[in-house]
């Protein structure tokens, strides 16, 4: 499968667009490119705010799933056990709520992704110490809208 086809399949699944020939959407992926663009929400300086936590000590914030994930893209979730190494962390501090995007690959053991997520989302300077649990990762900060608004991960 070519990289372009893989990206299109990922976005069709993430957006809930059925494939070609599926009842209700015979055009398949064409619908993605005709969909209206949703503007990014206004910023409220979310990195200065406290995170909310659920009953299982997971932060309540939006996480974009790594490419190939079957997780829902708009809710917080624990990383599935087969995604146990992180090679890139993208922090979007100007989103409301803040978004931390993890790309997982390899077989290294991931101790606790939520420790790093909380530190990245609420720390004033980027807390590099929290990333030590993740091993060697690339960290990027930007001011672009959330991925669900601008259509995908950054080029590598």
Swiss-Prot record:
Entry coiled-coil feature ranges: none
Compartment annotation: Virion membrane; Host cell membrane; Host Golgi apparatus, Host trans-Golgi network
InterPro entries: Herpes_gL_N, Herpes_gL_N_sf, HSV_GL_alphagamma
Signal sequence range: 1-16
Disulfide bonds: 71-95
Post-translation changes: O-glycosylated, and sialylated.
Domain gL alphaherpesvirus-type, first and last residues per copy: 50-156
Pfam families: Herpes_UL1
Topology of this chain in the membrane: Peripheral membrane protein
GO biological processes: fusion of virus membrane with host plasma membrane; symbiont entry into host cell
Top-level taxon in the UniProt lineage: Viruses
Protein keywords: Disulfide bond, Fusion of virus membrane with host cell membrane, Fusion of virus membrane with host membrane, Glycoprotein, Host cell membrane, Host Golgi apparatus, Host membrane, Membrane, Signal, Viral envelope protein, Viral penetration into host cytoplasm, Virion, Virus entry into host cell
Chief location bin: virion
GO cellular component: host cell Golgi apparatus; host cell plasma membrane; membrane; viral envelope; virion membrane
Function: The heterodimer glycoprotein H-glycoprotein L is required for the fusion of viral and plasma membranes leading to virus entry into the host cell. Acts as a functional inhibitor of gH and maintains gH in an inhibited form. Upon binding to host integrins, gL dissociates from gH leading to activation of the viral fusion glycoproteins gB and gH.
Family the UniProt entry places it in: Belongs to the herpesviridae glycoprotein L (gL) family. Alphaherpesvirinae gL subfamily.
Subunit structure: Interacts with glycoprotein H (gH); this interaction is necessary for the correct processing and cell surface expression of gH. The heterodimer gH/gL seems to interact with gB trimers during fusion.
Name of the protein described by the UniProt record: Envelope glycoprotein L
Lineage, top ranks: Viruses, Duplodnaviria, Heunggongvirae, Peploviricota, Herviviricetes
């Amino acid at each position: 499968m070519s990289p372009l086809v893989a990206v299109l399949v990922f976005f069709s699944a993430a957006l809930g667009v059925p494939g070609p020939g599926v009842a209700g959407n015979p055009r398949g992926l064409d619908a993605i490119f005709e969909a209206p663009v949703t503007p990014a929400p206004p910023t409220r300086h979310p990195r200065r705010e406290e995170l909310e936590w659920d009953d299982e000590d997971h932060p309540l914030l939006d996480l974009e799933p790594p490419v190939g994930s079957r997780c829902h893209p708009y809710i917080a979730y624990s990383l599935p056990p087969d995604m146990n190494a992180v090679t890139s962390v993208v922090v979007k501090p100007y989103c409301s709520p803040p978004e931390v995007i993890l790309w997982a690959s390899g077989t290294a053991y991931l101790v606790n992704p939520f420790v790093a997520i909380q530190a990245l989302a609420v720390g004033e300077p980027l807390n590099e110490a929290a990333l030590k649990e993740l091993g060697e990762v690339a960290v990027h900060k930007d001011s672009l809208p959330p991925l669900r608004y601008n259509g995908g991960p950054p080029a590598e």
